[in-house]
């Protein structure tokens, strides 16, 4: 266990990527923050770049596959394109080749204790997809790192009976701010968790990489301040998928953690059997 007097230098990364096309999840905007996660007042280093190779105008076209011909057809232009391209052109120093960005990131990871994001499943895959497009190999599997997923942390520990009580006592117009995009169920995005933690019902994320990484670093520090032992024992180095049905069904935090632990044990046993088979 890391003591409060010690440092725990962590990278929180956020990636904005292409979608709904053959360029799905190729990252065009990569940013991360680095800070001592054990100290809410510790300074935050910030890094942000646009990926030169993935800013080409043709990459912003949303496409679909024609059922009759099997060919890909243009649908519309990504609504983010104009603002992203304008900012990139206005700030040429923020535009770097992919290889250079990954080189800096790899160096940062090597001197950090962990790396994670709110949705590690998404961001880690986007990192690998971007790297694979130019190097024909994954990025993360080739470097030593300790991952974590804030969505995993918050959905299992912060979304608990106190959270549901808080939501239920809100007036209707405020309660709506904690719903998913469909409006059918309670949401659990970083934006919604920031609303809950800060009691700011109408907070809206910019959905730009650096701003989101800053918010997510704040969420990490909040979580560790409340659930330090659980973070290091249960979540660090063990990111897991989150089932939205556990939020919908208001499963207790204790039950979610029991199921999560059981899943971990099953995976460990499966890995042990596979290793024995190989030997």
What do these predicted ranges mean?
Residues 2-3, 171-182, 196, 210-279:
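Acidic two-metal-ion nuclease catalytic site recognized across multiple nuclease folds
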Residues 2-124, 128:
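Conserved non-catalytic scaffold segment of RNase H-like nuclease domains
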Residues 15-19, 152, 215:
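Short, glycine/acidic-enriched loop or turn micro-motifs at the edges of active sites
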Residues 19, 113-117, 138, 201-207:
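Short helix-to-loop capping/linker segments positioned immediately adjacent to catalytic or ligand/cofactor-binding
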Residues 22-24, 127, 131, 157-160, ...:
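Short, function-defining helix-loop hinge/capping sites that tune catalysis or transport
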Residues 55-58, 65-88, 150-213:
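Active-site-proximal helix-loop-helix substrate-binding element of RNase H-like nuclease domains
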Residues 121-148:
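Substrate-recognition/cap helix-loop segment adjacent to the acidic, metal-dependent catalytic center
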């Amino acid at each position: 266990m890391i003591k409060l007097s010690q440092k725990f230098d962590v990278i929180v990364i956020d990636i904005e990527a292409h979608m709904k096309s053959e360029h799905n999840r190729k990252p065009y905007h990569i940013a991360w923050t680095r800070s001592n996660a054990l100290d809410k007042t510790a300074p935050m280093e910030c890094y942000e770049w646009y990926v030169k190779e993935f800013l080409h105008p043709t990459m912003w076209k949303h496409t679909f596959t024609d059922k009759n011909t099997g060919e890909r057809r243009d649908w519309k232009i990504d609504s983010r394109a104009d603002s992203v391209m304008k900012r990139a052109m206005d700030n040429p120093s923020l535009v770097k080749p992919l290889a250079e960005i990954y080189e800096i990131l790899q160096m940062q990871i090597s001197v950090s204790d962990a790396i994670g994001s709110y949705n590690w499943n998404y961001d880690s895959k986007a990192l690998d997809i971007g790297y694979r497009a130019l190097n024909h190999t994954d990025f993360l599997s080739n470097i030593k790192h300790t991952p974590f997923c804030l969505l995993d942390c918050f959905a299992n520990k912060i979304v608990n009976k106190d959270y549901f009580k808080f939501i239920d006592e809100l007036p209707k117009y405020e309660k709506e701010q904690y719903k998913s995009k469909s409006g059918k169920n309670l949401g659990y995005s970083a934006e919604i968790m920031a609303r809950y933690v800060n009691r700011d019902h109408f907070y809206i994320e910019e959905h730009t990489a650096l701003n989101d990484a800053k918010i997510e670093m704040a969420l990490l520090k909040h979580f560790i301040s409340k659930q330090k032992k659980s973070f290091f024992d249960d979540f660090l180095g063990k990111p897991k998928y989150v089932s939205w049905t556990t939020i919908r069904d208001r499963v207790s935090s204790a039950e979610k953690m029991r199921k999560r632990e059981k899943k971990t044990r099953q995976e460990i046993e499966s890995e042990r059997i596979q290793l024995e088979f190989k030997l």
